[in-house]
Each structure stands twice: as structure tokens, then as C-alpha cells.
Amino acid sequence: MGNCTNDSYLIDGGKSNPYYDGTIMEFLQSRSPKDDPKNDYFSDLIEIIRLANMEEVLEEENVTFFAPTNWSIRKSVAMLNKMWYQMGNDSIKNLKQIKPSVWREYLSMYILKDKYTLKDIPQIDTTAIAAYPGQTFITYGGLPMNVGVVYGDANGVKYVGPRQILYSYIYDI
């Protein structure tokens, strides 16, 4: 019987600080290095924030921002281009082609006034929605959104696994 004695692949990073000492804009910029496209998650979002003239909101106001990544934004623009093509319209090739007011409206859907951490958001379980419905929050733009933490299962034990936030628009309030 043998075992692996080489554990050089193990790297103990120690405890990480869950708090970021900076503004939301600074955080987004730190995750969008110009010289490293592979690790660029938010450059499109940063451009949209600037086009919508919302930098001040994310730098100075006390808000929670559910930041869409480049992938999400590009996927949305691709879907919009498909719909526009079917209607006989030209494709969007540059984010500047969309009016700043439209960007502001859509960005506002992802911003909540006040700061919330995971412990401030109630549980949601889509298989037991009556027991764990999440909570309605009103966005920066005035829209009702249901927000809840989904507690994953681990090793067959309910609610002890990884957590993720479910964020969805409420149509009929």
C-alpha cells in the first residue's frame, strides 16, 4: 500500500479578510486589470457605469451592488442583437450606442440602498418557498426584487453546503 508524500501542492493562504477597504468602483477596477484579459471581469461594467454617470453612487453612497460580469453583459447584448436582427435593426457593436438613461435604469436594478452582508439576507429555498421565501428589497431605481440566500446541501445534509444569492425581479407587486 502506498501513499502520496509530496504535498507541495498544498498552499495554506491563512485566513482571508472578508471586508474590502475601498469603494465599489475601486473593487471593480481591481478585478479588471488592463494587462491581464484573462482576469478581467468588470471592464464592460465599468464602462457602462461611466456611460450612465453612476460613478458617484458607487463611490460615495452606502449601497449594495450585485455586479454583473463582462460575460453576463456580453451575453445580454448578444441576445438583444438577435432580437434586433429579427426586427431588421442594426447590431450593437459598442456599448456607447445605448442611451445613458437605459444603462442607468438597468444598473439601478442591481443596486440596493444601504449595505447588506450575507447575514442580512434571509434564506430562500425554491422547493420550500412558503417556509423560506427570501425577502423583497426595493432597488435604487424603485423596482421590487426578491433576494434570498440559497443554502446548498453537503454530503446529504441539508443547508450546510455552499451559499449563493438568488436575485430576481418580482413582476406582480
Residue ranges and their predicted role:
Residues 2-173:
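Mature, structured domains of secreted/extracytosolic soluble proteins
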